[in-house]
């Protein structure tokens, strides 16, 4: 009835469900936006990460998360010579002796994996706007002594 009232076609409505396992003993968690939030039409992924299980999206008062912008080469690959990682802020929750939430190799791996996902979403959805302005919003976890990266969920980013 509500859809009919607002003129929404029943056949145009989609619904999904996301199920994943619980992640015990998270070493880190974070969010990636696959577009440059600070310079439209420029390359760059914005990564916000936090040590442990503390929320990145709604952190407790006085908690700062690590924020990184990853710039990549013309192929959107972190494997080229022109990759740059720029730290905008560091977590204030790091234990002594730890300099950052994410290691460089984790940033490279995360960026490599997410670049592939972004290209597939962009092509499959038939997006007409510029590739660099198309964003996905991804959540990730780093778990275990070997620091395995899990992509928890992916959805289109809404400005």
Spans of model-derived segments:
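Conserved mixed alpha/beta core segments that line enzyme active sites in large multi-domain catalysts
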Residues: 1-159
């Amino acid at each position: 009835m509500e859809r009919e009232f607002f003129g929404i076609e029943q056949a145009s409505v989609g619904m999904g469900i996301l199920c994943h396992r619980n992640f015990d003993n998270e070493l880190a968690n974070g969010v990636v936006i696959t577009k440059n939030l600070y310079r439209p039409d420029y390359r760059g992924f914005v990564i916000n990460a936090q040590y442990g299980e503390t929320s990145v999206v709604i952190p407790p008062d006085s908690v700062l998360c690590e924020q990184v912008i990853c710039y990549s080469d013309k192929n959107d690959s972190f494997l080229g010579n022109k990759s740059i990682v720029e730290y905008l802020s560091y977590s204030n929750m790091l234990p002594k002796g730890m300099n950052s939430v994410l290691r460089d190799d984790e940033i490279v791996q995360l960026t490599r994996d997410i670049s592939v996902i972004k290209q597939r979403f962009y092509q499959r959805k038939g997006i007409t706007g510029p590739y660099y302005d198309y964003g996905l919003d991804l959540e990730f976890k780093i778990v275990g002594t070997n620091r395995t990266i899990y992509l928890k969920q992916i959805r289109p980013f809404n400005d």
